[in-house]
């Protein structure tokens, strides 16, 4: 996720104390902030920001970047009392998970510079429990040159149209999909997109749907449209090369960059990695199929990756100042669109020079459905657990019914533990 897609803080005035309200600086020199982030594909951008912040303020950002083991590292540090000054998480359900540990940003002046829609996923009962890092989209990315060279001019919107395009590509010797199935987070992102509109049409909205799942009054096995999920995963696997279950993020980005594969399910965060391999790659964005309902096909669009400040940090004011810098300084406002090349939560920020970001905005402006990342409302821990179950399905270990049974059991167990 990288998931998944996900801002950063600093002093707004260089000569001032790191602490507000008359508090004294705890050390003779500038503070050192500890940060625990994920998205290792952004390591160079993190490093650039760290260097810029150090140069402007003298404050050191001691940043650790993890990915697959991120949650276990964060949980271990929280349980041991070694909470980072600043850490990342998802939005939505993670607001509840970390509410006892994080600082409420609602009274900070710089928060008013953020887009109200970006704040929805971090707001609970009027409290703003995190800082939306990136505004991201995920769906199917395609190589425009490969499509054009093989005469695919009508972009697919339905499962049948994806199948027809894949057949044509495979007949030409092109691998239609690079699956990414080895990454636990790719499968949930792919799967839940296939039922996103169903949640609203049949279950009264995302919050209501998740509430019923949490209470056990609804199960995945009750949702008839889960066939959309299995049909889509089967299609990707069928046209996903000789070893679809061994494909990871690096495989996806490499194959689409070099034109050896035509389509990947990923987010706009993948573009920078693709361009490191092929700077001139011509990329486009496709809607994700919802069975064969062309009108329901859309993209997933939200701000999920979240920065949180530990409320009991000894460097609390320094951490708040860093976020203020991220939001208001020239470098901070340009960091996401200019360096990360993604959409910023800052309302007045410039648009990034990114094909996928530009296509995202264009599609939404033309009325293409943009669905929120509602699966991030599921209890913390479900993404990896349910992703592993879907990996088992794609590997042929379980059939559809056994997979639904496993999804129901895993969700119920995690939801009960979260109560």
Question: Whereabouts are the PLM-identified features?
Answer:
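Extracytoplasmic/periplasmic substrate-recognition and gating elements
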Residues: 51-52, 56, 60, 80, ...
């Amino acid at each position: 996720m990288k998931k998944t897609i996900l801002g950063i803080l600093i002093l707004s005035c260089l000569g001032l104390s790191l602490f507000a309200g008359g508090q004294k600086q705890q050390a003779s020199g500038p503070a050192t902030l500890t940060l625990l982030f994920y998205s290792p594909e952004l390591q160079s951008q993190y490093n650039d920001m760290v260097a810029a912040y150090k140069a402007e303020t003298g404050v050191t950002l001691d940043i650790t970047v993890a990915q697959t083991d991120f949650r276990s590292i964060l949980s271990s540090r929280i349980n041991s009392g070694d909470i980072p000054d600043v850490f990342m998480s998802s939005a939505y359900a993670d607001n509840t998970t970390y509410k006892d540990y994080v600082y409420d940003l609602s009274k900070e002046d710089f928060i008013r510079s953020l887009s109200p829609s970006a704040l929805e996923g971090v707001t609970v009962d009027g409290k703003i429990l995190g800082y939306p890092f990136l505004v991201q989209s995920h769906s199917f990315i395609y190589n425009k040159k490969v499509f054009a060279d093989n005469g695919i001019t009508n972009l697919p919107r339905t499962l049948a149209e994806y199948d027809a395009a894949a057949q044509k590509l495979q007949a030409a010797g092109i691998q239609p999909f690079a699956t990414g199935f080895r990454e636990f987070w790719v499968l949930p992102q792919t799967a839940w997109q296939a039922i996103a509109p169903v949640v609203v049409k049949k279950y009264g909205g995302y919050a209501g749907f998740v509430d019923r799942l949490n209470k056990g009054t609804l199960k995945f096995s009750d949702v008839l449209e889960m066939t959309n999920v299995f049909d889509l995963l089967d299609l990707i696997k069928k046209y996903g090369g000789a070893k679809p279950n061994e494909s990871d993020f690096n495989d996806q980005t490499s194959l689409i960059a070099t034109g050896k594969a035509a389509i990947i399910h990923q987010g706009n965060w993948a573009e920078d990695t693709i361009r490191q391999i092929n700077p001139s790659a011509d990329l486009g964005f496709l809607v994700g199929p919802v069975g064969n309902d062309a009108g329901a096909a859309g993209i997933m669009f939200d701000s999920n990756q979240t920065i949180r400040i530990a409320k009991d940090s000894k460097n609390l004011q320094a951490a708040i100042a860093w976020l203020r810098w991220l939001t208001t300084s020239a470098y901070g406002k340009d960091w996401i669109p200019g360096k990360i090349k993604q959409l910023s939560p800052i309302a007045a920020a410039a648009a990034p020079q990114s094909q996928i970001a530009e296509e995202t905005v264009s599609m939404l402006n033309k009325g293409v459905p943009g669905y929120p990342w509602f699966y991030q409302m599921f209890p913390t821990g479900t993404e990896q657990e349910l992703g592993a179950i879907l990996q088992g399905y794609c590997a042929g270990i379980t059939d559809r019914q056994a997979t639904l049974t496993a999804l129901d059991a895993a969700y119920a167990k995690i939801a009960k533990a979260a109560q």
